[in-house]
UniProtKB/Swiss-Prot annotation:
InterPro entries, A to Z: Chaperonin_GroES, Chaperonin_GroES_sf, Chaprnonin_Cpn10_CS, GroES-like_sf
GO CC field: cytoplasm
Record's protein name: Co-chaperonin GroES
Pfam family, one: Cpn10
Cellular location(s): Cytoplasm
GO biological process: chaperone cofactor-dependent protein refolding
Family: Belongs to the GroES chaperonin family.
Subunit description: Heptamer of 7 subunits arranged in a ring. Interacts with the chaperonin GroEL.
Known role: Together with the chaperonin GroEL, plays an essential role in assisting protein folding. The GroEL-GroES system forms a nano-cage that allows encapsulation of the non-native substrate proteins and provides a physical environment optimized to promote and accelerate protein folding. GroES binds to the apical surface of the GroEL ring, thereby capping the opening of the GroEL channel.
Organism: Streptomyces avermitilis (strain ATCC 31267 / DSM 46492 / JCM 5070 / NBRC 14893 / NCIMB 12804 / NRRL 8165 / MA-4680)
Keyword field: Chaperone, Cytoplasm
GO molecular function, one term: metal ion binding
Predominant localisation class: cytoplasm
Length: 102
């Protein structure tokens, strides 16, 4: 797979992807506002850029995700990056647990 990107000038290498985390719920079902200190880290995000894949035995292995996919990822996986005032997460493809089909 060739490197694809959307809306972001970050080009991931090898089997890495750039994800924009989706915002966590701001209120409970009963209408209570959840303070920032009580919110869990989001584990869902939109794929904005995909690396070309990693090499194994001389062959490049393509990734299972594409730009625009909504993915679930490991709670503590990846590296948080702030670029041009936006927050992104750079993940290894191994940190992606599932693709959400909506």
């Amino acid at each position: 797979m060739t490197t694809a990107s959307s809306k972001v000038a970050i080009k991931p290498l090898e089997d890495r992807i750039v994800v924009q985390p989706l915002d966590a719920e701001q209120t409970t079902a009963s209408g209570l506002v959840i303070p920032d200190t009580a919110k869990e880290k989001p584990q869902e995000g939109v794929v904005l850029a995909v690396g070309p894949g990693r090499f194994e035995d001389g062959n490049r292995l393509p990734l299972d995700v594409t730009v625009g996919d909504v993915v679930l990822y490991s709670k503590y996986g990846g590296t948080e990056v702030k670029y041009n005032g936006e927050e992104y997460l750079v993940l290894s493809a191994r940190d992606v647990l599932a693709i959400v089909e909506k």
